[in-house]
């Protein structure tokens, strides 16, 4: 399993003059297109969307450390370069973690959909191969969505912690194997 993206919302606790800061920070700001300043932190590997209210969204991180480094850098840049005054410590909340998974064996999506319909741990299943080649499996706990593909590849989305995709993979593997389908490879 590999984490592909972590998205976090942040309250920086201070108003930001986006017109001024976009020039100083060399960010992208086109208020008629989008109300936030797009600030790329290429050395960290994240993109930050900064809003006038001091709210911010950080995306592109592969781990929490990158989120916190990004928040620290943005606060420092806004404070030192743009003169923004902050009122307290930033509040960071993970909104979504996306992970990719490889089961290393082809998945029989028709059978998986059939056997997991009505399972107590499954909130919902969508599988319409004419519309989309993957099976969408929504779990109750952890509350995530898994996209399973015939190739054995999968994507987990909606996680709030790094452990949730691992728990989801384990739970799905156990359920599938319980019904006699093999996932070892």
UniProtKB/Swiss-Prot annotation:
GO molecular function: DNA binding; DNA-binding transcription factor activity
Signal sequence, renumbered to the chain: none
One Pfam family here: TBP
SUPFAM superfamilies: TATA-box binding protein-like
Chain segments annotated as coiled-coil in the UniProt record: none
One record GO biological process: DNA-templated transcription initiation
Positions annotated as Sequence repeat: 3-78, 94-176
Keyword Protein biosynthesis listed: no
Xref: InterPro entries: TBP (IPR000814), TBP_CS (IPR030491), TBP_dom_sf (IPR012295)
Keywords: DNA-binding, Repeat, Transcription, Transcription regulation
Family assignment from sequence similarity: Belongs to the TBP family.
Function text: General factor that plays a role in the activation of archaeal genes transcribed by RNA polymerase. Binds specifically to the TATA box promoter element which lies close to the position of transcription initiation.
Full protein name: TATA-box-binding protein
Organism encoding this protein: Methanopyrus kandleri (strain AV19 / DSM 6324 / JCM 9639 / NBRC 100938)
Lineage start: Archaea, Methanobacteriati, Methanobacteriota, Methanomada group, Methanopyri
């Amino acid at each position: 399993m590999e984490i592909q993206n972590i998205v976090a919302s942040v309250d920086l606790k201070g108003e930001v003059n986006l017109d001024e800061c976009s020039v100083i920070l060399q960010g992208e700001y086109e208020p008629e297109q989008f109300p936030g300043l797009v600030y790329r932190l290429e050395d960290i590997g994240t993109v930050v969307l900064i809003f006038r209210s001091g709210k911010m969204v950080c995306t592109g991180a592969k781990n929490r450390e990158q989120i916190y480094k990004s928040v620290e850098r943005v606060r420092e840049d806004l404070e030192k370069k743009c003169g923004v005054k902050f009122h307290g410590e930033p509040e960071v909340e993970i909104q979504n973690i996306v992970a990719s998974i490889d089961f290393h064996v082809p998945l029989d999506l028709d059978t998986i959909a059939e056997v997991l319909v009505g399972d107590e741990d499954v909130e919902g299943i969508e599988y319409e191969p004419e519309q989309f080649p993957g099976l969408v499996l929504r779990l109750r706990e952890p509350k995530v969505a898994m996209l399973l593909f015939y190739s054995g590849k999968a994507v987990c989305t909606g996680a709030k912690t790094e452990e949730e995709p691992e728990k989801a993979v384990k739970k799905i593997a156990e359920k599938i194997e319980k019904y006699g389908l093999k996932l070892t490879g």
